[in-house]
Amino acid sequence: MNKILIVFCALCTFQFSIMAQSFRTTSAIYNVKNFGAKGNGTVMDTKSINKAITAAATEGGGTVYFPAGNYLSGSIRLKSNITLCLDAGATLIAAPGENADEYDVPENKIDNMYEDFGHRHWHNSLIWGENLHDISIIGSGMIWGKGLERSNKGEDDKRPNKSISLYLCRNVIIRDISMLHAGWFGILATGVDNLTIDNVKMDTNRDGMDIDCCQNVRVSNCSINSPNDDGICLKSSYGLGFARATENVTITNCQVSGFEEGSFLDGTYKRNDSRRPTGRIKMGTESNGGFKNIAISNCVFEYCSGLALETVDGAQLEDVTINNITMRDIVNAPIFLRLGARMRGPEGTPVGMLRRVIISNIVAYNVDGKAGAIISGIPGNDIEDISLHDINIYFKGGGTKEQASIEVPGLENGYPEPGRFGVTPAYGFFVRHVDGISFDNIHLGLMSNDDRPSFVLDSVKNASFRFVNTPVRQGLENLYLKNTENVKIFQSFGSEDTTVKKVSFVKM
C-alpha cells in the first residue's frame, strides 16, 4: 500500500512539474517598467506599455504586468494572447487633453449613421483591441479615465472617449479591476464572443458597460455606479455594418446605482435629488440585431432608474428571464418594457417583436409616484407572452383622480424612456398594446395616498390576474379596462372571480 502511495505521489509531482513548466513557458511576465515605463503619473508611459505588449505578442503571448504606480498613457493597443495585469496600487491613467497626440484617432470603419458616434469608432480609447482572441484585463488595480470625454460633438471630434473598447474579439476576460470616470463608455464590447466580465467595480458618469452584438457573455459580481447613464446595457446596434443579435447572456450577482460620480468607490454614496439618476440594467436603445436567450438574476438596484427592456429599431427581443431582483429608491418606472418604431436602421426594416419574457421574484421599495411600471407596444404591433409573478412593489403615491384620466402619448417613433410618457393613469401598471400577459401573486403597496387605479389596461388581449393584492381604498377602483378582450380575474382585488370577454371601457 505504501509503495502504491509513493508511486502515486511521484506521478502527481511529475505532472504538476510539467504543468508549471508549461505555464512558465506560455505565460511569461513582461514588467512594463523593464520597457521604460516610469509609473510616476507625470511622464507619458504609452510607448513603453505598447512596447511591452509587442514583445509579449512576438513570443506568442504573455502577461504585461503593471506593478504599483501611476501610469499616464494614451492608446494602448492590445494583441492576441495578452493579459494586462494591474497589481494592487497600480493606476492606469488616461492622459488629459494636452496629450491628444498620445491617442489613436477614430477610424472610419463603417459609413452608416444608424448609431451614435461612440458606437462607430473604437481606436479613440485608452485600451482597444480589434480582431483579437484570448485577451484578459485583470488585477486589483484601477483604470482612471481622467482625460476621456463623456461625449463627442461630431464626426470631426477626435478626442478619446472610452476606457476599454473591443471590436470583433473572442475569448475575453475582464476581472477584478476598478474603474473611475471611465468616459462615454467604460467597457464597449462590439461583436465580442465568449466574454467574461467578473468582479469589476466601476464609478463613472456615462454608460458603465455596453455589450453590443455579442454572444455567449457572462457578467457577474460587478458593481456599476453611473448617475447619468446606464450601468449595464445590452445593445444590438448596426455598429458592425450589419445586424447581429446579442444572445446567450447571463447577468448575475450585480449591483447598479446612480450616486454622484466618485462617491461609490470612496464610500460616501452622495445623492443629487435635483436630477433623476440612471444607472440601471437595460436592453436597448440600439436594437437592430435583437436580444435572445438572456438571463438576469440576483441583482440589486439602488437610487437609480428601473429595469428597462426596449426594442425600437426592428429587432426581436425574446426569451428573457429576470429573477430575484431587489430595488430601492427608484426614480421612475420600476419595470419598463417597450416595443416601438424609432427605426434607426436600413430603410424597409419591419417593426420588431418583444415576446416571451418572464419577470419574477422582484421587491421594489420607495418607487417614484409619477409613473407606474409601463409595458407598451404600439398599434398593430403588440408585445406578446409576458409573465409577471411574485412581485412586491411599494410606490410613493401622490396621484390624483384627475390623473387617472390622463391619455398617455403613443410616442411610436420616439426615443423610449419612461419619463417621456409623463404621469401614467395607473400608479401600479400601465399596460397597452399587449397580447398575452399574466399577473400572478402580485402585491402593490402605497407609501401615501393615491387616487389612481392600480392597473390600467388599454388595447390588451388575453390578460389574467391571479392572487393580485392591492390597497383597499374607499370609493376607488383598482382596475380600468379599455378596448380590452378576454381578461380573467381570480382571487384578486378583493372582488369576485370573473372573466371579461370584450369591453370598450369599464372600471372595476
Model-derived features: positions:
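Extracellular/periplasmic carbohydrate-active domains that bind, remodel
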Residues: 12, 17-508
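Sec-dependent N-terminal signal peptides
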Residues: 4-14
